[in-house]
């Protein structure tokens, strides 16, 4: 009986947490179909309208904001993976007494508030003439996501059976061939989940984009923030813009859900 009640309590707790996390998204989706008047004085009884979506999509430079988000997120994700894969491979298969210290130091950088390094990063970007450029965002996003990427790749590398590499060496494979032809195919599900996580982090990032860009390189997060200005807070349009920004990630996650689940459980059962 005790075990049954624990199971039920865990189920209720899980559903409560899930609903609490889903509620803001559901509320934003609901608000997106309201007029500004209905959104400002929240009501559940309203006539749905697509006016907010229409105004957001027809707003000047929207395709540019969308293109910037796609470019910055994709490029920074690929760069972070390109650096993290050999780094994680080297730390997992050729560790030394400082490997764990390096990993902990990299992880500790994620605990530093971004505002603490805003001024030096801004001055560096200004000196290098990179303000309001995609290059600046790509560099910052790549460096910001690199610790997570290295940690995840390092973990996946440790979960790969060493016997596979011993067999490859017996067949005459060198280090490069082990990495490309043995390790990468084996940990592909893990890399897929890592790539999706990095893409989501880059897509959702707002702090650096708001401080390092204005118009030319501004992503969708800046576009969404523009609906909160001195003239007021336009809840319906802000919600519509947020829903449109969330949609690509939801679709991508749905399409890659099989790889994502396999990646999250990679190495759980050997």
Q: Where is each model-derived feature located?
A:
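A hydrophobic, multi-pass inner-membrane permease signature
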Residues: 1-270
């Amino acid at each position: 009986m005790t075990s049954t009640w624990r199971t039920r309590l865990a189920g209720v707790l899980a559903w409560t947490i899930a609903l609490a996390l889903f509620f803001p998204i559901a509320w934003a989706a609901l608000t997106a179909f309201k007029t500004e008047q209905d959104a400002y004085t929240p009501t559940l009884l309203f006539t749905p309208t697509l006016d907010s979506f229409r105004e957001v999509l027809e707003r000047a430079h929207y395709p540019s904001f969308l293109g910037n988000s796609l470019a910055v997120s994709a490029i920074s994700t690929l760069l972070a993976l390109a650096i993290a894969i050999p780094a994680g491979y080297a730390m997992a298969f050729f560790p030394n007494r400082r490997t764990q210290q390096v990993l902990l130091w990299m992880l500790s950088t994620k605990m530093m508030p971004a505002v603490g390094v805003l001024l030096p990063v801004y001055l560096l970007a200004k000196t290098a003439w990179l303000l309001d450029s995609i290059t600046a965002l790509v560099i910052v996003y790549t460096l910001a996501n690199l610790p997570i990427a290295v940690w995840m790749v390092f973990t996946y590398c440790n979960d790969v059976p060493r016997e596979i590499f011993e067999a490859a060496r017996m067949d005459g494979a060198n280090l490069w061939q082990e990495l490309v032809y043995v390790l990468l195919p084996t940990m592909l599900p893990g890399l897929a989940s890592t790539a999706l996580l990095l893409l989501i982090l880059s897509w959702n990032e707002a702090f650096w984009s708001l401080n390092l860009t204005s118009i030319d390189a501004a992503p969708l997060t800046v576009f969404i923030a523009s609906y909160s200005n001195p003239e007021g807070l336009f809840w319906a349009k802000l919600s519509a813009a947020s829903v449109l920004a969330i949609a690509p990630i939801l679709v991508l996650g749905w399409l890659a859900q099989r790889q994502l689940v396999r990646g999250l459980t990679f190495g759980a059962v050997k």
